[in-house]
């Protein structure tokens, strides 16, 4: 099927000046139309705010400098996943438009459009019918919404662009055997691997294409030039698997499958993706997680049916190689996510729409070519409506994508929609609870955390978040119970040790608080918040020198840490052990006050105490009165009462001392 004499684009366009000009105008018009339709299909996501792990993928504050850019490349673990080129692009985007979400979304959409346009060129060079239809389906198919509308999946759209660029250059090398296009293809492949290593399957995909074109493979012509691609892809894949396991966390009970069970997963995954590609309804951000067991007989039906399909296609390949080639491309490109390798999202579900971003091309191309051939043959039931079939199909897919991309408007909508479509998604309940917790809707948050624990009682995250909600609600004892249960599941959970330290600090159990803060530092030695809180506890215990040292360590880690700066100023201003440092206390308090715009009554309270320690009682009284008035305006009654006491001392030219001093 499709076995025709090869001709490149230049040969085709030189067949006649009128035809070349007409072809050129038609291509530009179709390109513009494809971009416009794709932009409109993703319109609801244009201003979508960051969701789920976007904050972990977007450039962290500590990586936004040139030094941070260097760490992106040289320090695995500095970013959530080691994809340095993708994170470099995030870094550049942050320099250009900061936290403006539309910039990130529009770039991903345009990268996706560029890939679709490159796909047209590739299919034309391979002389596969329906190139524009295949590109349009790829561009607006709703299965791609997760890759395009989710900021983090710039990894997919960027690596996809390099994937297509590499294939296009390699096809030119295959025709000319010149070194230049080969070098370009290899360079694009390397760039793609540094964006997302899922494209490591590219050399196998190229061999499938060559087998489809020629009916056989030659070691010297076809395989040998791809050896560097295989070596680089394998090395990148092994490294990524190590990162997923050791740095991202793709290990533990959720990943304990036998080899037989992994084959069962693979068979089911392939049919699942094929089904969603053909019938793209009820797409979910987190699909139900299957219970896979090698003792359940019906789970063997999936790999068995796949094997039978391949046998049929192999027999048909004696006359028509295209169907087998398309299915093999689909399966091979899916290989990294078929279950044989551990990837972190498997913790929540064994399937995800963005996993088949590139693999979908195997089926899309078959469908588009089939439609194009039917139109060309002019069958009686096709002729009356001609290309309206194609227009209707693309329009329908674009509408579905428009609806699907609306799910990515904001994080709350994402989790609510996920729960509506998959009520048993414990992760969605947990994450929606986190959103509600941040909004101060504690009762609603607690409901979702408890629902998450009903579904998955052994997950430490939901248990820890329930503890945090209870702590904010004032139920300190029950919060401590939940935190301890979380630690039973995950003993080295640094965040929970930190939260437990805070809970014990509220209860006045200072030794317990110190123990948990120190446990946190074992896992997170550069956590400025922990050093600050340790300083608070030590100061309450009268260990002023130790407290000051911990505040200074917090500021060393994060010089913009206002609270640590204020706490250090308070320790210096209210301790009789530090009279010679009163000027330092004033300077620190002034800096903290400037950083908060002079609108924080607690910071002004510290500045007043620093002035008093320095003997500047008139400034202390003036600043104390400003602080008192702000506290009254902000309904901070306890702070206002404390300030009345302190002002009474300043009026007598007496500096304030904390009770334990």
Where are these regions (language model features)?
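Structural marker of alpha-solenoid helical repeat scaffolds
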Residues: 421, 455, 489, 523, ...
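Polytopic membrane enzymes that build or remodel cell-surface glycoconjugates and lipids
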Residues: 2-468, 495, 533
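Conserved alpha-helical positions within TPR/SEL1-like repeat arrays
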Residues: 426-437, 461-472, 495-506, 529-540, ...
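Terminal, low-structured helical/coil segments at or just beyond the last alpha-helical repeat
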Residues: 578-583, 591-594, 598-601, 613-617, ...
């Amino acid at each position: 099927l499709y076995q025709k004499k090869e001709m490149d684009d230049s040969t085709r366009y030189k067949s006649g000046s009128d035809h070349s000009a007409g072809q050129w105008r038609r291509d530009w018009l179709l390109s513009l139309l494809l971009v416009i339709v794709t932009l409109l299909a993703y319109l609801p996501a244009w201003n979508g705010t960051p969701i789920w792990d976007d904050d972990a993928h977007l450039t962290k504050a500590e990586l936004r400098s040139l030094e941070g850019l260097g760490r992106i490349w040289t320090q695995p673990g500095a970013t959530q996943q080691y994809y340095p080129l993708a994170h470099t692009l995030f870094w550049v985007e942050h320099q250009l438009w900061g936290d403006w979400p539309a910039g990130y979304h529009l770039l991903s959409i345009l990268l996706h459009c560029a890939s679709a346009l490159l796909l047209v060129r590739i299919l034309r060079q391979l002389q596969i019918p329906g190139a524009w239809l295949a590109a349009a389906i790829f561009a607006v198919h709703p299965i791609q919404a997760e890759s395009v509308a989710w900021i983090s999946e710039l990894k997919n759209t960027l690596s996809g662009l390099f994937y297509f660029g590499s294939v296009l250059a390699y096809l030119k090398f295959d025709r000319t055997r010149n070194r230049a296009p080969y070098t370009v293809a290899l360079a694009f492949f390397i760039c793609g691997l540094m964006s997302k290593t899922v494209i490591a399957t590219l050399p196998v995909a190229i061999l499938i294409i060559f087998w489809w074109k020629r009916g056989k493979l030659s070691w010297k012509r076809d395989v040998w030039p791809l050896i560097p691609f295989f070596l680089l892809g394998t090395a990148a894949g092994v490294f990524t698997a190590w990162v997923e396991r050791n740095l991202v966390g793709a290990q533990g009970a959720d990943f304990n499958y036998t080899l037989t069970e992994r084959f069962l997963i693979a068979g089911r995954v392939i049919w699942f993706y094929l089904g969603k590609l053909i019938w793209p309804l009820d797409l979910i951000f987190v699909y139900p997680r299957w219970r896979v067991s090698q003792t359940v007989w019906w789970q063997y039906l999936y790999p068995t049916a796949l094997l039978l399909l391949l046998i049929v296609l192999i027999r048909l390949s004696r006359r028509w190689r295209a169907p087998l080639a398309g299915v093999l491309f689909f399966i091979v490109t899916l290989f990294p996510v078929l279950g044989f390798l551990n990837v972190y999202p498997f913790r929540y579900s064994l399937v995800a729409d963005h996993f088949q971003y590139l693999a979908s091309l195997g089926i899309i191309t078959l469908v588009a070519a089939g439609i194009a051939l039917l139109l060309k043959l002019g069958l009686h039931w096709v002729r009356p409506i001609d290309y309206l079939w194609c227009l209707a199909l693309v329009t329908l897919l674009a509408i579905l994508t428009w609806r699907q991309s609306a799910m990515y408007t904001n994080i709350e909508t994402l989790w609510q929609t996920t729960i509506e479509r998959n009520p048993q998604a414990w992760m969605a309940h947990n994450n929606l609870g986190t959103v509600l917790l941040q909004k101060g809707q504690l009762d609603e948050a607690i409901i979702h955390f408890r629902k998450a624990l009903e579904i998955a009682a052994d997950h430490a995250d939901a248990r820890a978040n329930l503890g945090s909600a209870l702590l904010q609600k004032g139920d300190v004892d029950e919060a401590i119970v939940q935190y301890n249960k979380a630690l039973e599941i995950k003993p080295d959970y640094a965040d929970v040790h930190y939260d437990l330290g805070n809970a014990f600090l509220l209860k006045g159990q200072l030794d317990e608080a110190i123990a948990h803060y120190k446990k946190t530092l074992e896992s997170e030695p550069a956590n400025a918040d922990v050093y600050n809180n340790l300083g608070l506890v030590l100061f309450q215990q009268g260990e002023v020198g130790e407290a000051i040292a911990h505040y200074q360590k917090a500021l060393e880690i994060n010089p913009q840490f206002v609270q640590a700066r204020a706490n250090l100023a308070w320790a210096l201003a209210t301790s009789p052990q530090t009279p010679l440092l009163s000027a330092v206390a004033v300077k620190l308090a002034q800096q903290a006050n400037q950083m908060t715009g002079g609108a924080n009554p607690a910071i002004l309270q510290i500045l007043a105490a620093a002035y008093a320690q320095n003997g500047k009682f008139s400034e202390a009284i003036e600043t104390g009165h400003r602080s008192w008035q702000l506290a009254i305006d902000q309904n901070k009654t306890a702070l206002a009462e404390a300030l009345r006491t302190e002002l009474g001392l300043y009026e007598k030219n007496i500096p304030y001392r904390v009770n334990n001093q």
